[in-house]
Amino acid sequence: MSTFQGEVTTLPPDKSISHRAALIGALAEGTTEISNFSGGYDNQSTLSVLRDAGISIRQEELSAGDGRIERRVVIESNGLWSFREPSVPLMCNNSGSTMRMMAGIMAAQPFRSELVGDASLMKRPMKRVADPLRQMGAEISLSDAGTAPVVIHGTKALKTIEYRLPVPSAQVKSLVAFAALHADGQSKIIEPIRSRDHTELMLGLATIDRPDGVREIIIDGRKPIAAKPFKVPADPSAACFMIALGLLGERSEIVLRNVCLNPTRVAYIDVLQEAGAGLGIENVRSEGGEPVGDIVVRSCSGLKPLRISDHGVVAGVIDEVPMLAVLSAFASGEFELHNAAELRTKESDRIDALVVNLQRLGFECEQYADGFVVKGRKTVASEEVEIECFDDHRIAMSFTIAAEAAGASLRLSDRDVAGVSFPNFFALIDSLRQ
């Protein structure tokens, strides 16, 4: 395998924080400036949907002074009810985050709206979106299969809610919080298993951590939200791919600068360090309420097999599972995952997608309803292998790293889908290759 070395300052801005900064800016009173906003397709879909719903948004590209081009987004809004009835369906493209969180906002607006997406998003489950919003008084209709289009007849008279999350989901938590901001009174979200907490941090919501590990999130409705600036750090989920590249490369060392180190986002780093990965964290500081720092990754030849089953750990690494599975398979020949049925409802059925493609590379795999196991590798693919991306950016990027590890020629069914979250993915790999 090649050697990869260098300092990376061009990781994509964090996808989750970019979504939320734009949505909160649309709910705030005044001018919200967001620096280092993501240029990924999903985040651009959020801006497009907000514009179609009547929010004034300006986006410009600026030189960051270190060779990077940084996007700055400026949002003008008059507060919670600044939205206008859309004249067209709100097109979320491939972004489940846009569709789900925007539903919470549209449920509080006194008009009809419709959220739609691309073919992949239109297959994803939306009942978990509709249930709490119906309890709050919004009229929501879905397809017979419980999927989009999400048709919303909103109301200014949303009721408060005490909602216990049935599964760990930062998107559902956020949509309930956004809806509750419009309700007359205090609402509470009960979170048995922690998920990423950017929404709570960025809105400054009160939280209570109970002795039993359950978190309560308190939302006081109908209070004005003051506009404030946001600075978006580098995306730790994108960093995971470069970490895998560095660990699998020969005599490699990569430094990833200014990465978000929110504990709810970097559980995969703990998993890798416990398995013996050569990872270090440096220059940790706080920016905008989020811990940020640099990640140093070095080649590692003794990585132990990854076995992940704890519900809390699974929730913390759910987006990184594709890369962790490929990394563990190539580094140790083994990988095991349980309690991750949520992966079957992502951009693709990621359990099936991983098993299908790992088998094409010669790995012996077995899948279950909630996970799968990689038992070893029987053959090494020497000819060109066709990798089916299933229109899923994380599958495409994970198996690009697999191609580097295998030294094989892989043909991706949809290379461009990486641009959903990581527009410069392929260029960055080439820039690090020695």
Swiss-Prot record:
Q: Which residues bind phosphoenolpyruvate?
A: K15, G96, R124, Q171, R350, R394
This protein's record includes keyword Amino-acid biosynthesis: yes
GO cellular component terms listed in the entry, alphabetical order: cytoplasm
Can you say what this protein is called? 3-phosphoshikimate 1-carboxyvinyltransferase
Compartments reported by the entry: Cytoplasm
Q: State the protein's purpose.
A: Catalyzes the transfer of the enolpyruvyl moiety of phosphoenolpyruvate (PEP) to the 5-hydroxyl of shikimate-3-phosphate (S3P) to produce enolpyruvyl shikimate-3-phosphate and inorganic phosphate.
Which pathway does the database say it acts in? Metabolic intermediate biosynthesis; chorismate biosynthesis; chorismate from D-erythrose 4-phosphate and phosphoenolpyruvate: step 6/7
InterPro entries assigned: Enolpyruvate_Tfrase_dom, Enolpyruvate_Tfrase_sf, EPSP_synthase, EPSP_synthase_CS, RNA3'P_cycl/enolpyr_Trfase_a/b
Chief localisation class? cytoplasm
**Catalytically driven reaction(s):** 3-phosphoshikimate + phosphoenolpyruvate = 5-O-(1-carboxyvinyl)-3-phosphoshikimate + phosphate
Q: What class of enzyme is it?
A: transferase
Q: Which Gene3D superfamilies match?
A: Enolpyruvate transferase domain
Q: Which organism is it from?
A: Chlorobaculum tepidum (strain ATCC 49652 / DSM 12025 / NBRC 103806 / TLS) (Chlorobium tepidum)
The EC number on file is 2.5.1.19
